[in-house]
Amino acid sequence: MANNGENGRHQEVGHKSLLQSDALYQYILDTSVYPREPEPMKELREITAKHPWNIMTTSADEGQFLSMLIKLINAKNTMEIGVFTGYSSLATAMALPDDGKILAMDINRENYEIGLPVIEKAGLAHKIEFKEGPALPVLDQMIEDGKYHGSYDFIFVDADKDNYLNYHKRLIDLVKVGGLIGYDNTLWNGSVVAPPDAPLRKYVRYYRDFVLELNKALAADPRIEICQLPVGDGITLCRRIS
């Protein structure tokens, strides 16, 4: 059993690992993730670790999972809402074929430009179309245009949790039948099962109800099949079936 010091340390990284043992999570990273992590992803991960908001990044094990997923479904046309420094975008770009594409949207280009030199050095910048600004107006325009319906193989959402349901209402039309939408942080630091009086960080408490609402809505949506996994901070995969 972990001692109090270990528990304390784990709480600081708990947003990205739901495992109760730091040692077990470190074992996964040291044995299966870091030895196989491509050099560009390692470089960007280490750069991002120095950012004051580094907790916003995709964890290395989740990056590995996304890369495997992209390859398994033979994705070619993808979208990402919420980019930060681009670690998950880089993982996706490395897994896509040379003519694969990512429409990457985030409200802060400055953060993306931290990772852009790494992406460019890896020869992958041509796969990523970055749009700065809120994603909802872009999605609305795409739906209005009509030509984007059912055009995406994979969509990854790691952005403002209070808009996840608004994203879902639109993305379900843009992903193809048989395609996947991945919603990140759906276990939200484990707070989805925390009692009402639990001592939670302010931002965790604020977004918890939105995450709970999303999870309930996805479970009841007949247009998708779902699988919720305790990878990183929880990811729910939604496969469009109608």
Curated annotation (Swiss-Prot):
Keywords from the named record: Cytoplasm, Lignin biosynthesis, Metal-binding, Methyltransferase, S-adenosyl-L-methionine, Transferase
Reactions performed catalytically: (E)-caffeoyl-CoA + S-adenosyl-L-methionine = (E)-feruloyl-CoA + S-adenosyl-L-homocysteine + H(+); (E)-5-hydroxyferuloyl-CoA + S-adenosyl-L-methionine = (E)-sinapoyl-CoA + S-adenosyl-L-homocysteine + H(+)
Single GO cellular component term: cytosol
GO MF term list: caffeoyl-CoA O-methyltransferase activity; metal ion binding
Chief localization: cytoplasm
Amino-acid positions noted as binding substrate in the UniProt annotation, renumbered to this chain: 16, 158, 189
Tissue expression pattern: Mostly expressed in petal limbs and tubes, and, at low levels, in stems, roots and leaves.
Cofactor, free-text remark: Binds 1 divalent metal cation per subunit.
Binding site for a divalent metal cation: 158, 184-185
Subcellular location: Cytoplasm, Cytosol
Pathway of action: Aromatic compound metabolism; phenylpropanoid biosynthesis
CDD domains reported in the protein's UniProt record: AdoMet_MTases
Amino acids binding S-adenosyl-L-methionine: 58, 80, 82-83, 88, 106, 135, 160
InterPro entries: Cation-dep_OMT, SAM-dependent_MTases_sf, SAM_O-MeTrfase
EC number: 2.1.1.104, 2.1.1.-
Enzyme class: transferase
Keyword S-adenosyl-L-methionine: yes
Induction: Circadian-regulation with peak levels occurring in the afternoon in flowers.
GO BP terms in the entry: circadian rhythm; green leaf volatile biosynthetic process; lignin biosynthetic process; methylation; phenylpropanoid metabolic process
Obligatory cofactor(s): a divalent metal cation
Pfam family, one: Methyltransf_3
Family listed: Belongs to the class I-like SAM-binding methyltransferase superfamily. Cation-dependent O-methyltransferase family. CCoAMT subfamily.
Function: Involved in the production of floral volatile phenylpropanoids in flowers of fragrant cultivars (e.g. cv. Mitchell and cv. V26) from cinnamic acid, a common precursor with the anthocyanin biosynthesis pathway involved in flower pigmentation. Methylates caffeoyl-CoA to feruloyl-CoA, also able to methylate 5-hydroxyferuloyl-CoA.
Name this protein carries in UniProt: Caffeoyl-CoA O-methyltransferase 2
Organism (species): Petunia hybrida (Petunia)
